[in-house]
């Protein structure tokens, strides 16, 4: 008997040693399930690597770890992501964005009519659903699901290129307020892209997983997700590894695009006051928008940033800009208020190849100016925060963790507003741009059976939950 036990013990030790050596020296298995964050403004894809427990957010062919959620239709092809972004100003009527706002959602004709004025492309009302009309060689009707499928196909191809193998399975995130039809429509979009969805996870839960909160002892988690076009605030109640969404609120028309617009309006006014005209060429407006986005990004780490754009002198306008894109809102800063930018004007004219005169508009934008232009918008972030606390019957001091999601939460003044409200610093240990995709990738690894084993996040459905919107 003793001899048999010795043999058995030796066999077990041999197996353990073989397993250890395999983990140390054999190539790690390739991830089989990808995690997708299909965002309103940007989308991304990631994988969880067995053995190391690391998440890799997969870049596109140019090194971008997220791509714009935009799809352009032309006579010859369909362009996605950054290629679509480049066509947005020259082909606006055929460049679809914000499709996530429409996917699977039921609209009354009046509700949809209130939305369509915000977009340069045609939005149609078909049997309670939104569809898009685009014109290439002919006019075609495309659904939000089809637009989403083109984005998902691009993400799938990025993952396949990186992993060097076909990908068929995915976990995908959706807003917590998505109903069953919106979730099923998102799955349908994935199916059109050749993906089988193993699980749909709520974005706030995914973010909490990225921060590791599914493995630590916290009870109440507030997730603030501020992206390019929307603000979502979710109150999560964590019990063990289970997450219950207690309350949701937000603003579907507040995000980084709005902050950009305030600065763009300010620059338009500077240009008009200096040169007496407003930029009207699509490519120059596009360059101005790109410059504004770059300024916003630079101001997250620097106190000031430069704008330098070559503009073609058009016919001089007889009056200052009124209404629309070129007007600085009346409640915003005006020259002489002590916060003016430090302008560097080059009034000397040069000639372009077309014979038109050109000027180089240069200016320095301070963080102080950017914050002042947007302070009222920054304060609006607190409104849905206060609402979820009210609906959750909680005081702000009872929140264990405040986590930030979305690129716009990088703005220092926004972090300061949140810190001042709660009296403590929000958790910023995870890249806010990648929080959701990181969490989804972790869940994809769990569903794919990767090791080391992770604690899965279980979501408790709350069928009575409704999101309060402040638009």
Curated annotation (Swiss-Prot):
Its main location: other. Residues 317-330 have a biased composition (Basic and acidic residues). Residues 317-350 are annotated as: Disordered. GO terms for molecular function: ATP binding; ATP-dependent protein folding chaperone. It comes from the Eukaryota. GO terms for cellular component: endoplasmic reticulum. CDD domains: ASKHA_NBD_HSP70_HSPA13. Keywords: ATP-binding, Endoplasmic reticulum, Microsome, Nucleotide-binding, Signal. It holds the Pfam family HSP70. Residues 1-22 form the signal peptide. The keyword ATP-binding applies. It is found in: Microsome; Endoplasmic reticulum. Has peptide-independent ATPase activity. Binds UBQLN2. Belongs to the heat shock protein 70 family. This is Heat shock 70 kDa protein 13. It comes from Mus musculus. The gene is Hspa13.
């Amino acid at each position: 008997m003793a001899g048999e036990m010795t043999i058995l013990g030796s066999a077990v030790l041999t197996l353990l040693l073989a397993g250890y050596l395999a983990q140390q020296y054999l190539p790690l298995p390739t991830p089989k399930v990808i995690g997708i964050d299909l965002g309103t403004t940007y989308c991304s894809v990631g994988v969880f690597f067995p053995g190391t427990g690391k998440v890799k957010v997969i870049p596109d062919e140019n090194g971008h770890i997220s791509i714009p959620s935009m799809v352009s239709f032309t006579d010859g092809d369909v362009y996605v992501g950054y290629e679509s972004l480049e066509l947005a100003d020259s082909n606006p009527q055929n460049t679809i964005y914000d499709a996530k706002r429409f996917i699977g959602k039921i609209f009354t004709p009046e509700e949809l009519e209130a939305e369509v004025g915000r977009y340069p492309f045609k939005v149609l009302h078909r049997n309670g659903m939104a569809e898009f009309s685009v014109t290439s060689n002919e006019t075609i009707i495309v659904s939000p699901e089809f637009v989403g499928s083109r984005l998902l196909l691009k993400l799938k191809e990025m993952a396949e290129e990186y992993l060097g193998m076909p990908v068929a399975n995915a976990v995908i995130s959706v807003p917590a307020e998505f109903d069953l039809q919106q979730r099923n429509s998102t799955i349908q979009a994935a199916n059109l892209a050749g993906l089988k969805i193993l699980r749909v996870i709520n974005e706030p839960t995914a973010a909490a997983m990225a921060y590791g909160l599914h493995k630590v002892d916290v009870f109440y988690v507030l997730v603030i997700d501020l992206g390019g076009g929307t603000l979502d605030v979710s109150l999560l109640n964590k019990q063990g590894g289970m997450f219950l969404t207690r309350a949701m609120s937000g603003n579907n028309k507040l995000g980084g695009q709005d902050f950009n617009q305030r600065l763009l309006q300010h620059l338009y006014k500077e240009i008009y006051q200096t040169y007496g005209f407003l930029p009207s060429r699509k490519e120059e407006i596009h360059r101005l928008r790109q410059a504004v986005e770059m300024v916003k990004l630079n101001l997250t780490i620097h106190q000031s940033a430069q704008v330098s754009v070559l503009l073609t002198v058009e016919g001089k306008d007889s009056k200052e800009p009124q209404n629309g894109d070129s007007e600085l809102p009346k409640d915003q800063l005006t020259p002489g208020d002590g916060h003016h930018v430090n302008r560097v004007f080059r009034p000397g004219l040069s000639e372009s190849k077309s014979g038109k005169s050109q000027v180089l508009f240069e200016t320095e934008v301070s963080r102080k100016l950017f914050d002042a232009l947007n302070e009222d918008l920054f304060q609006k972030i607190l409104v849905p925060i206060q609402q979820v606390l009210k609906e959750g019957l909680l005081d702000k001091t009872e929140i264990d963790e405040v986590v930030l999601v979305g690129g716009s939460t990088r703005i220092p003044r926004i972090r300061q507003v949140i810190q001042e409200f709660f009296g403590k610093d929000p958790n910023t240990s995870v890249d806010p741009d990648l929080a959701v995709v990181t969490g989804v990738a972790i869940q994809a690894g769990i569903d794919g059976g990767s090791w080391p084993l992770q604690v899965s996040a279980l979501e408790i459905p709350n069928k009575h939950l409704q999101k309060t919107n402040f638009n």
